[in-house]
Design a protein with these regions (language model features):
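Positively charged, amphipathic and often flexible ligand-engagement surfaces
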Residues: 2-399
């Protein structure tokens, strides 16, 4: 793709184009999304609704169907990989990839870890078999005991018995990464809380050294709201260059803000996060630049709902003469959110994917509650979604 074509596409790129953003939604689906975000736009309604859903589930009242057609239907692909096929196909029609995200938060025991491992292996096979699924993804806490991950990065370390359990989980990790390597499937390892992240990083880089010599298979996630993360990214790039492997990077702002601040306050240590959102935004955008500057060595994905960061990346790609569909660069958003970004980027020829959570309704509820609460607490995010849906409803009325 030429520099000229890139410039032309950038000029026509608009995150305000709701006709493109919601083209795949019928009038009924559009109105349903409109009402979901109308409710989520009211913080007190989110809290009230969450309380009653938890209560009804606890009392085993028949609310599964209501949940499945509302919150679950908005943010999840289905209860199984098979149920996600319709979503995968719909996204693919718009040239948007799917990242199947098994979002079940199971118990911390070996039986649960094995079930999760087996499900992750299924998503890797599914990705290998379908060009519509460019990545697989998982969390370390799906296969590791979180207390062991935390203890591993302390001075005390693990006991002999704990070491056995830890190594068993590490075997699951190696099995997952080996399968991704064998199937040539790119694999995101999601970031988690700072008190277990050092362990996750260590394991992740060990897997990169093992599997990323031909191309980026293993991707680590960098949460740019952490004060040390930009430096960590630069260091990771340097190590990858020094040891001759490809660095897989997923850039995010960060998902555990309130949890991190609460723990820092309770345990009386300095918060590892930026005090101001502007500093997070700055580091996120500098992280994009660092990846672009080392594009031969780095494959990266920007996981963001921030329009400015997406536009900046598009602008920098144009300035450097990098084609929209460069295989080392991806954009990603969550299913059911920021369709104005995803669909308009895809329409302009950029590589885009949606995170598509799936799993049994009752098991995915903790994820959905967090999503609803996070949306209502992120300044402007829900009202932005609501305003765009409102705009498209009005546009269709006037046709």
């Amino acid at each position: 793709m030429t520099h000229q074509t890139s410039s032309k596409n950038l000029k026509k790129l608009s995150f305000e184009d709701t006709q493109i953003a919601f083209a795949s939604k019928s009038d009924f689906q559009l109105r349903k999304s409109y009402w979901i975000f109308a409710i989520m736009n009211q913080n007190w309604l989110v809290k009230l609704g969450t309380f009653f859903i938890k209560l009804f589930l606890f009392l085993h009242l028949p609310v599964k169907k209501i949940i499945k057609t509302t919150l679950f239907g908005q943010f999840c692909g289905g209860e199984s990989i098979q149920e996600c096929q319709t979503t995968i196909q719909e996204l693919d029609k718009a040239h948007i990839g799917t990242i199947l995200d098994y979002s079940v938060e199971g118990e911390e025991n070996d039986k649960s870890f094995q079930l999760t491992k087996n499900e992750i292996l299924k998503t890797i096979i599914q990705s290998h078999e379908s060009s519509a699924i460019p990545y697989a993804v998982f969390k370390m806490t799906g296969i590791f005991n979180s207390e062991l991950l935390e203890k591993y990065q302390t001075e005390k370390g693990l006991s002999e018995e704990e070491e056995i359990d830890f190594l068993k989980s590490k075997d699951y990790l190696i099995e997952i990464c080996q399968e991704a390597y064998n199937q040539e499937v790119r694999l995101f390892i999601d970031a988690e809380e700072s008190w277990i992240q050092n362990t996750i990083d260590e394991l992740c880089y060990e897997m990169m050294q093992r599997f990323n010599h031909k191309t980026s298979i293993i991707f680590n996630t960098f949460q740019m709201y952490r004060v040390d993360m930009l430096e960590n990214l630069h260091h990771a790039i340097h190590v990858a260059q020094d040891q001759s492997y490809f660095l897989g990077v997923k850039l995010v702002r960060g998902a555990y803000l309130e949890k991190e601040r609460l723990r820092a306050h309770e345990d009386e240590y300095s918060e590892p996060l930026h005090k101001e959102k502007e500093a997070t935004d700055r580091d996120f955008n500098l992280g994009i630049q660092a990846c672009l500057d080392h594009l031969e060595q780095v494959h990266f994905c920007v996981g963001t709902h921030n329009e400015q960061s997406c536009r900046l990346l598009c602008q920098w790609m144009e300035e450097k003469g990098i084609s929209q569909n460069h295989p080392h660069i991806y954009f990603a958003q969550l299913l059911g959110m920021s369709d104005n970004i995803s669909y308009n980027l895809a329409s302009s020829g950029y590589n885009v994917a949606k995170y598509v959570p799936y799993g049994p309704v009752s098991a995915v509820m903790p994820y959905l509650f967090r999503r609803a609460e996070e949306n209502s607490s992120i300044a402007g995010q829900t009202s932005r979604e609501f305003a765009l849906l409102q705009k498209e409803v009005s546009r269709r009325k006037n046709l």
